[in-house]
């Protein structure tokens, strides 16, 4: 499924859209792409 992960880095909030099996994997993929980020939210995209 496609998942929108909202991330926060250095005072900026941005979205990372990833394909993953579940929310946990989506979070891991987004953090692997942006290692210094904090996850704000994880939402499915239809």
Region roles according to the model:
Residues 16-18:
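Generic detection of short hydrophobic beta-strand segments and adjacent strand-loop junctions
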Residues 1-14:
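Short aromatic-glycine-(Arg/Gly/Cys) micro-motifs in beta-strand/loop hairpins
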Residues 32-46:
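Short, mixed-charge low-complexity intrinsically disordered segments
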Residues 14, 23, 44-45:
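Intrinsic disorder/low-complexity segments
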């Amino acid at each position: 499924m496609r998942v929108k992960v909202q991330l926060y880095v250095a005072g900026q909030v941005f979205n990372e859209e990833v394909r993953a099996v579940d929310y946990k994997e989506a979070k891991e993929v987004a953090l692997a792409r942006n290692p210094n980020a904090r996850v704000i939210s994880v939402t499915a995209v239809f």
